[in-house]
Each structure stands twice: as structure tokens, then as C-alpha cells.
Amino acid sequence: YTPVSDVNLLAIYRYYSPYYSNPYANALCSWSRMRDEHGGYIGLEYNKLKNWQLSTFADVWKNGYEVMAQGDWLPKQNYHMHMRFRVKEKDEACTYSLRWNMAYQMGRWKMKTQADGNLVKGALTYGWSVLQDVEYRFSGFPIVVQMRAQFFDAREWTNRIYIDEHDVLYAYAMPFVYGIGGRFLLNARYKIND
């Protein structure tokens, strides 16, 4: 629903019977399976401020809730900054998470810096991750090289951090990390008929 040109509003009520079962369903729910749940979701997006896009949502169900607020700042076409704060209470644990990233492009170079952190209130555990992506497009040769360096400290499973990453063509991966360590990725893409 768009009450005015710069505001978008979405409201959804869901009810899944305890007797309903569909292993291939893909709908809004708090668990990975759609069964025995009812709840409400409301989202708001605001685009009135120059170079800013603000959005928030709340999802409430029988045994928990999730609330998120995020802001995107786009001062120039080649620069983008994003910040997101999320609170999720589920299974008697409350998780606070924060993500900040900045992406920019300079000629043939594309860079992205990202920092993630979370805190589980019930267990008083935390996790963090920082990463740097670098992409280069060669001139006169149809190849793109992408590199990533990531370091993390998420000692508990409840503090795992999900990070999106490039995969093979037309595929998308969202692995998680936990423990203490680093990851280094190198991905090259060659366009045959260019």
C-alpha cells in the first residue's frame, strides 16, 4: 500500500494450521517450516529524504518477535552506505545484531567493506565479523576478478554470522561463520562471447 508517493506500507497476517504440511512451500514464517503458526508482519519504507531510504519492519508470532530498522545513504551513483539494526526474540533468547557496509566504485575497481556484530542477551555471548571485497574489471579482456578477506570471532553457535557471497553464475550463497578464524576467497568470471 502506498498512501503517499514516498511511503510504502505492507501488512500481512498469517495462519498455518497444525495439520498443514508442505515440504516445498516458501512463505513468510518464523521457522523453516510452515506449520502451526500465526502472526503478523508490518513493514514501512520511507523515501522522502534526499539520498536516503529508510525502512523498518516488525514480525510478531506466538512465541517471539523480530524488529528491524535500516537506513541506506546514496549520496552519489558510485557510493552506497548501509546500516541495519535487528532485535529477535525466539526460544527465550534475545539477539541484537548490527550490520554496517559501505560500497564504492572507482573506475574499474569496486570495493565493499562490511562489519557485522551480534549479542545474545540470555547467554551474554557475542560475535563479530569484518570483511573487505575487491573487484576488478580488466580493460579489453572479458574477465572480472573478485577477492575477499574476512576475519571473524563468533565462538558460540548462537552467534553465527551469515554473509552473502558470489558463487558460480546465476547462483547465490549465504554461508555462516562461527568460531575464530578467517576466510579468503578468489573468484574469476570470464565472458566467452563478449
Feature annotation, model-predicted:
Residues Y1-D194:
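Exposed, low-structure sequence patches enriched in small/polar residues
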